[in-house]
Amino acid sequence: MEAVQIVDDNVRVFDEIYEIGMVTEEIIDAAMTKPWWQDVQYGVIDIAGTQHQAMPAPAEVWLANTGLYLSSQKVGIMDGTERLKSFLKVDPIAGYPRLSINPNCRGLLSEFGAVPNPFTGQTQAYRWKMDRDGNIVGNTPEDKYNHGVKALIYGLVYHFGFSYASDRQKIKVKHW
C-alpha cells in the first residue's frame, strides 16, 4: 500500500505499508494507525481485488471496515508503464520528475532496483524478462516484485488517466 500526496500535479509517495503474509483486515488496521489516515480521500485497488475467492472481495472488506470505496479498472501492463514513465521523466520547465519517493519507502524503491528488497536483502527489482545473454525477451516485464509499482500505476491512471503519445510530426521524404 502506497500513501501519496498530489500537489500541483506532482506525485509524492511519502509512506507505505509493504508487508508479506498479512490479510486485508491486518493491512487496514496498519493503515488506520498511521497519522495520515484521517486525511485519506480515495484509494485504488487491482481489479482482482474486486473478485470473490471463497471470501469477501478485498475491496468489499475495505468498504465495510473503513467506509472507503476503492476504485479499480483494468490497466494493461504497457499502458501502465507508459503512464509511470511520464512521471519519471524530468519536467523540462521544473527541472525534476513529477514523481518523488520518500527514501523510507524501501519496498517500492526495491521494486525500482534502488535498494535491496526489505524482506530478503537481495536485489529483486521489477524488470523485463532476459535471456542468458542479457537480452530482453518478450513484450512484457516479469510479473513479480511489482506490487508497489502496480499500486502506484493504478493510482496514477485513476487520477491522471492513461498516457498517450503526443502528436508526432510527419516528415515527408522524397524518394528518388
Residue ranges and their predicted role:
Residues 1-3:
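Short beta-strand motif preference
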Residues 5-137, 162-163, 173-176:
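Mg2+-dependent endonuclease catalytic cores in nucleic-acid-processing enzymes, primarily RNase H-like
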Residues 135-176:
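Charge-patterned, long linear interaction tracts outside catalytic cores
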